[in-house]
Amino acid sequence: MGSYVISDIHGCYDELIRMLEKINLEDSDTLICAGDYVDKGPKNAEVLEWIMNVPPNVILLRGNHDEDFAQNIEAMRIISYKMDLDRDSLQDTKTLYRSMKKLAKKDASVKFDRCETVYELIESGYTFSRLCAW
């Protein structure tokens, strides 16, 4: 029965899997993931898919990058109510994203998708409803 802590995955899925293989996590072990799952790395989509399917012995905490990501999605949700969008349409998701980027350019105080994680996920095929599931 071991306890492990990892953090700052930042979209580095391959490295995450190598770490998990190295510790050989068993059902009796506890793994605490201390946040910052997304941004910077090349495989944010894969890391998010892993998060959505973790076993019960894995505790997930949000980091500042995850909070920023969640705020980006919430901002998109607010704007989406003003638009006639199909949340399951990739094209409508791209339209919503472009609208958000335009809004952010108009107001320097608005920070939206600075690391382009949302953009990467949309380009990987994530629709707005799938983004909201996270």
Segment roles from a protein language model:
Residues 45-48, 53-134:
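Active-site neighborhood of divalent metal-dependent phosphoester bond hydrolases
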Residues 1-50:
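N-terminal active-site segment of His-dependent metallophosphoesterases
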